[in-house]
Amino acid sequence: ASNPGLQRALYAIRIGLRSEGVREWNYSVGLHVPGGMNDRELLAAADLACKAQVWDRCINTSERTREAIDWKQRFPMPFHDAVIAKANSIGLDPAYVYGLIRQESRFIMDARSHVGASGLMQVMPATAKWTARKIGMTDFQPQMINDRDVNITIGTSYLKLALDDFEGSMAMAAAGYNAGPGRPRNWRNGPVLEGAIWAENVPFTETRDYVKKVLSNTTNYAAMITGRPQSLKARLGTVGPKVTTAEYNPDLP
């Protein structure tokens, strides 16, 4: 914990110099000694980041351990009350929300993507506007998406609308969240497959990787929340052509 490089890194991140801080952190963790830190040092460094609520460094540092594994560091649950309450209020599995946020932003509240998505749940401006209208958030302004609770409300509401549109398939809804809903609607039109096999056949590399990571994260979070082992296979379910006659929501962005 007394490592000056790590302290400098956390200070830089705290005052808004995120990329410099991350560079300093990564250097301190991995490059200043041959082979990098050992497991005990990595867990101590991750703990330092967790305590400072720098969740991306907490997760990424803890994931570097080779033998000792700290699941709470690898799968933290920040903003616990806000996420659980919102997910439960709209009938969404909180583990799924956490699994998605971990992949989208690593819990960095002011994360911005190169395509303009914002916040914890990386919501696009047009999607935010559409979702706000859909859920009756009449006072919504574009800049509000950077507010933590608004971001969680909009992101979870959109995810639930996508999940309902895909008849509860977490794999397809995750693909839709990443690539837009039109693509997974087409990708499901082959034979009925186990979700894991379907995910392996998603033609976009980024979306394929995303779906697998979100569902794997979700399974780990569900195990932590329930205190019971979980099945990734059960969570992925099966994916195949639409069996109900209900129409897709044509304006789902």
Ranges and model annotations:
Residues A1, G5-R8, I15-P253:
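Catalytic glycan-binding domains that act on GlcNAc-containing polysaccharides
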